[in-house]
């Protein structure tokens, strides 16, 4: 969002309506955000304030399994070998381009695997790209 501070997050479980993403914005900017989205014909479900204990979730989460690391972004998960950087598994989502991306990336080192955003066209591929970028950064930093 041009000129509007925002952050891509996962909506809290009680606000999810499927395979959702959310933009965290300052609620004061709600009218400007609505105008901008409307002028670009971007459809959105709602703009809601978080209520008290409702917490927006980080889109990317990392789990270290010792020899491997799993990076979860949204509903997509990418697991890679910490030493070699080889993609061990891709799972999650339900979008039609994920089986193709899985076949293209599996068993390849992260730095030689294709970027999901260059080959996919769905929300799942966007989230897989987030997981890929984070995985590459973790691997280049020695698995941390």
Language-model features, listed with the residues they occupy:
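Structured beta-strand/loop patches that form or line metal/cofactor-binding pockets in enzymes
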Residues: 47-83
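Helix N-cap motif at beta-to-alpha junctions
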Residues: 25-31
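Active-site- and interface-proximal helix/loop "cap" or "latch" segments in soluble metabolic
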Residues: 30, 69-144
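Ordered, small/hydrophobic-rich secondary-structure cores
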Residues: 1-16, 82
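General beta-strand structural signal in soluble alpha/beta enzymes
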Residues: 8-9, 45-47
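Short amphipathic alpha-helices in soluble, non-transmembrane regions
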Residues: 2, 33-42
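A broad structural signal for short, well-ordered beta-strand segments within beta-sheet-rich domains
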Residues: 41-44, 87
